[in-house]
């Protein structure tokens, strides 16, 4: 749920450990 929506990954994903995702969809 982190590659579909850049905000969705913050809500329901174990990747919330690091806010900067490995994919360039989330520049923050």
UniProtKB/Swiss-Prot annotation:
Residues 9-20 have a biased composition (Low complexity). The lineage of its organism: Eukaryota, Viridiplantae, Streptophyta, Embryophyta, Tracheophyta. Residues 1-28 are annotated as: Disordered. GO terms for molecular function: nutrient reservoir activity. Keywords: Seed storage protein, Storage protein. GO terms for cellular component: cytoplasm. This is Omega-gliadin. The keyword ATP-binding does not apply.
